[in-house]
Each structure stands twice: as structure tokens, then as C-alpha cells.
Amino acid sequence: MKNEEYWNKRAASYDEHVITEYADANEQTVSRSLAYLKGSDEVLEIACGTGIMTLGIIDHVSHITAIDISSAMLDRLREKTEGRYTNLSLMHTDIFDHEFDDKKFDVIAAYNVLLYMENVSEVLRRIHSLLRPGGMFLSASDCVGGIDNADAAEKRRRVEKGELSFVGFFTPDELAKTIEKAGFTVLESENIHEGTPNQFIAAKRI
């Protein structure tokens, strides 16, 4: 199953699951992100999903371009935001869209998606290229490397069954080092979730 198909199927129940399992982590992700955001910021949010994080930060920035490969996830976000925001653009695409080639952003956010990207190093280099000098990269990601629990087992099962094409089993330290290798200075790296680590990372473009 392609990742887009998987996330389209998850869209209807996604909020219920994530809000239940990651309520505190979501709140911390938003509050920690706000410490790095300014009212003048142009933000690109990768894999915005149903907009849980989008809605948490949109009132604090100039504009968000929110993108996702799942049309169903974007439909859910569109339902939540229709007619409410003039500083939000939704796009059914990914970060390698050539439309972004000549654009620069103050902040790029990738919440709870890096572990599903087999080409994560390439993605991080692309993020670096789309940020203005000194721009910020904000991320939160489950880090299941070295973890032996039901969540890690379920992620392995989904890959084995072909529901997901890839899950990265990296540790928080490995993820931070991968981000640094892409040309960033990590300013903050903190686990914000009990159980499976959900690592919030704020990194500045060098």
C-alpha cells in the first residue's frame, strides 16, 4: 500500500487517536514551537495532516503553507478552517514540488512525519535549501530505535503487511545527529511523551 493510501484511510479517525494518545505531547509541541515563532514568519508545514499543529500556531505567524500527500487529511483540515483564516494555504503535494524551488521560508515544520520518510536525509537537505539563512526547523517525531513495546511492534507489523512503505527506527540522538549533518545547529531536543519517545527538536539553519 502506498503511504498516501494509508493516510487517506487513517484520516477519518486520525484526530481521535492522536488527541487521545498524544494530548500532552501535542500541547508541548505547540508551546515549544511558539518560543521560536514570530508574527512575521512565513511557515511551511510538511505533512500537516488534519491540522492539529497547524491550528495551534497559525494565529502566531504571518502565513502557513500546509502541505500533505494525503488528500483526505487535507479535506479534514479544510473542513476545520474554511472561511476562518486568510493566512493559510493548503497544497496536496510534498516538499520536492518544484513550485517551492524559488521560495524561501522563515520556518519549516515537520511534526510526526520524519520516521515515515525513507529519504529523511534528502528531505532535511531540501528543508535546509528552502530556509532563509538563520531560519528554523521545528520537528516532533516518535523515536522507536531500541524500543521494544507494543507501539514499535505495531509499526513493524504495518511495514511487514505493506500498509506503510517505511518506518525509521532511529533513536532521539540519531535523529538529532542526522539533522545536524544536514546543516543545522540543534538548539533544543527534548522527549515530550511518556512511553515511546516523541522527540521535539528545534534546529537553526547554519
Where are these regions (language model features)?
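Conserved class I S-adenosyl-L-methionine
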Residues: 1-38, 138-163, 193
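Class I SAM-dependent methyltransferase SAM/SAH-binding core
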Residues: 44-97
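A conserved beta-strand element that flanks and buttresses the S-adenosyl-L-methionine
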Residues: 109
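Short alpha-helix
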Residues: 166-182
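Core SAM-dependent methyltransferase catalytic element
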Residues: 182-184, 188-206
